Amino acid sequence: MKKIISIALALLMVAVMLPVMAMAEGANVVSTPDALTAAVTKGGEVTLGDNITASITIPAGTNVTLNLGGFTLTGNGNHTITNEGTLTVIGSGKVVNTDGGKAALFNTVNAVANLNGGTFEGNTWYVIKNLGTITMNGASVTQNDTGSSAIDNGWYGNPGNDCNVNHPDGYTAKLTIANGNFSGGMNTVKNDDYGVLEISGGTFSNTNGPTVLNWNVATISGGEFKVNSTATSVIANGSFNTEADKGQLTITGGQFTSSDNGNGNLLGYGVGGKDGGSVTISGGKFTGKMVAEGYPYEPVISGGTFSDQENAKK
């Protein structure tokens, strides 16, 4: 009887171990720059097994899932990650770049990135530069440089800031943010030329500039937005009245808190960008001054709650 029980237990242990062994054999765990480069070039799921210093490229037509595994990937002389294909980032850990004029992630034209985990950091340029399509649902972005935005979605208008990539006719860069923590920068999120921005959730904070600066088409339906500098507004909207810079901002929800315990301005505009544009507000909670002095237009407000009821014209 004891022998039968022993055999049964042994078989049970084998059955339990098989999935674990299969997972271990199938997982591509990399711990060196060369191994990481080879793995992302091939495609599939790749897991960091150590901190790695390397600049990698996801080739066009290649699908890569990068599990940071609690480790840090630091760039080495170029963008830390250049995505030309399809990239999904999961797990805890960091993607960092400290090189001048380089991003932690550069997502180029027609590339797709799904950022579901990890923290992206930079301190000399944009942390994320997007010319393709990015969806963020769980990743965080920290910008330590007040001279650059944390995220730039779209074209700036010069080769250096656009990674020498010209704008294809009829093309839009799209950034969708559903969740995550975003902080710092000249602007935390800048929706640039030909950019389409959709924010439905997340926490956005800045001690230097606006949490969001929109130049083209942006919609905010949720999230928390807060600034601490009395010299800046929570949200800024600019327009040059062109196809690239329409300056169309729509807010249907979210919580917006200005500086100085809610005594600062909620709305501002991009420098030089006062040629047309529109701000439409139908929902959200706004704590701060709704004065739009200097704006080229009056915000259209049909809903929402405001601490400054006097200036929130409905």
Please provide the spans of the model-predicted regions.
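Hydrophobic core
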Residues: 9, 13-17
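Positively charged n-region of N-terminal signal peptides that target proteins for export
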Residues: 1-9
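Glycine-rich repeat segments that build the extracellular carbohydrate-interaction surface of secreted
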Residues: 39-53, 64-69
